[in-house]
């Protein structure tokens, strides 16, 4: 993820959009399974990623979700994705996890999927974070409770003009609802994607 192009979600009262430098995320190691039992068959690939992580990241935080807590959405635009951003959300104090999940998946993401020139929408809603879930060696895993993140949305755009128009014109309108459920939105531009395992084979 970009080390310089981040923190560009529109500002709103009560919403943290500037990412503290010591909490900035370098990248994402994302694993998506086709079936509920697929993780059992992928243990060898998971072990490879576990050992290799120190070569890529300085701090990693493993976020997991229940089955069906991740969604891929059909968008109104069928053009290929040229640019991607990832939005991380911190749940607002007092908001129940079920209400937050409904907002992310059925509210915000569903709206995003209908926007022209948005070519990709993917959501993940996380279980409570636990360091023991992914305690890779020689990589930092510190994650104070006040810094926890609870969901993410990956957005794809057809081109740079569409991306700029979204953040300038549409994203500010979404904040009226976002601030009811989230206390922070941290946005990063995804510079490149590097497959580690594809079709069960190490790249």
Enumerate the language-model features and the residues they cover.
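Macromolecular interaction modules
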Residues: 1-203
């Amino acid at each position: 993820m970009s080390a310089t192009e981040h923190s560009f979600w529109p500002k709103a009262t009560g919403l943290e959009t500037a990412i503290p430098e010591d909490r900035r995320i370098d990248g994402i190691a994302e694993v998506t399974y086709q079936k509920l039992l697929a993780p059992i068959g992928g243990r060898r690939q998971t072990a490879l990623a576990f050992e290799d992580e120190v070569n890529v990241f300085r701090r990693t935080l493993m976020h997991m979700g229940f089955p069906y807590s991740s969604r891929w959405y059909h968008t109104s635009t069928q053009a290929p994705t040229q640019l991607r951003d990832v939005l991380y959300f911190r749940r607002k104090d007092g908001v129940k996890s079920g209400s937050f999940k409904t907002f992310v998946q059925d509210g915000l993401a569903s709206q995003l999927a209908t926007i022209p020139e948005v070519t990709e929408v993917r959501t993940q809603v996380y279980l409570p974070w636990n360091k023991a879930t992914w305690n890779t060696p020689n990589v930092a895993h510190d994650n104070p409770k006040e810094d926890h993140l609870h969901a993410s949305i990956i957005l794809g755009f057809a081109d740079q003009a569409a991306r700029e128009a979204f953040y300038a014109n549409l994203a500010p309108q979404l904040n009226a609802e976002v601030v009811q459920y989230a206390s922070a939105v941290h946005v990063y531009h995804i510079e490149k994607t590097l497959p580690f395992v594809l079709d069960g084979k190490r790249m």
